[in-house]
Structure formats: structure tokens, C-alpha cells
Amino acid sequence: MTTRLLLLADTHVPKRARDLPAAVWSEVERADVVLHAGDWVDERLLDALGSRSRRLVAVWGNNDHGALRERLPEVARVQIEGVRFAVVHETGAAAGRERRCAERFSDVDVLVFGHSHIPWDTTAPSGLRLLNPGSPTDRRRQPHCTYLTVVAHEGRLGDVTLHRLAR
């Protein structure tokens, strides 16, 4: 079986946008699993995404407080199609990230993270794949708002695609 995943982080709704872009909601409808790496800001988006997703795996971020921290873990771990994922918001500075994350998440194949709003796709020497989808609502110093789609099949990742949203 093939499983289609949507990777999101740093949505900051309603602070950075009133809602997720229509293209992201379309991806939610197509995805088998949505992974969200935190910074929701408002619990209403968690409820909306939870009700519209087939399956949601999510964590809280540094801008999430109160009910969001009560409802979500700091780190989530899930196995999908034989691929072991961890989801976390904060991984620290870019310098040394692969080494730090490979040590902290030695039991997973893929780490999905957020916080920087900067898309990231690297593989640590240990084999750990690190993916940051950027932000679909707040591009910061990036030219575009972004998100990732990924396909998991028979223990492997494929079709890792960074989607750039029009301003």
C-alpha cells in the first residue's frame, strides 16, 4: 500500500493568516495522514484540521499554550508503511542539527520539524532524514510560503515535494 502524507508546520492561524490557503486544504483532502510540527497558535485550527484529516499526527510549538499544550505532545512518534517518523517543533540552531537530531532520534527514520519557517530536507550521516515543510502562512525571509507532500511505501519515502504557494 502507498500512503500520501502532508507535512505542515508554523501555521500561526489566525495570527499570520485568517485560515490555511485553499491549496493546503485541498492537500488535506488528498492526504492519508497529515503531520503538523507545531505553532498552531489557536485551537480552532487543530479542531478543523482534525475533523478534515483522515489521520492527524501533531505536536505543540513554542507559540502554542494552554489547551494546545494540554491536547498535544511535545514529540509524536508514528510508523507509517514501515517508515518510523518523529514529529517535533524545535530542533535548535541549523549548525550541528543533523548530529544532534541523529542522537536524540536514533530510533526513527524521518524527523519532521518546524520553528524556523525555512524548508529543510537533508539526511544525517546516520541515515536520519530531516524534513521541515516551512510555513504555509508566514514566509519570513523566504521567497514563498511552503509545505511538503511525501509518499511512504514499503518502508521507503518517495516523491518528497516542496510546494511553493503564491503570495
Which residues make up each language-model segment?
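N-terminal active-site segment of His-dependent metallophosphoesterases
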Residues: 1-51, 64-73, 82, 143-145
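Binuclear metal-dependent phosphoesterase catalytic core
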Residues: 2, 8, 80-81, 103-107, ...
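Active-site neighborhood of phospho(di)ester-bond hydrolases with catalytic His/Asp-centered motifs
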Residues: 7-9, 33-39, 57-62, 87-89, ...
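Short, structured coil segments at secondary-structure junctions
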Residues: 52-53, 126
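Helix-adjacent hinge/juxtasegments
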Residues: 55-96
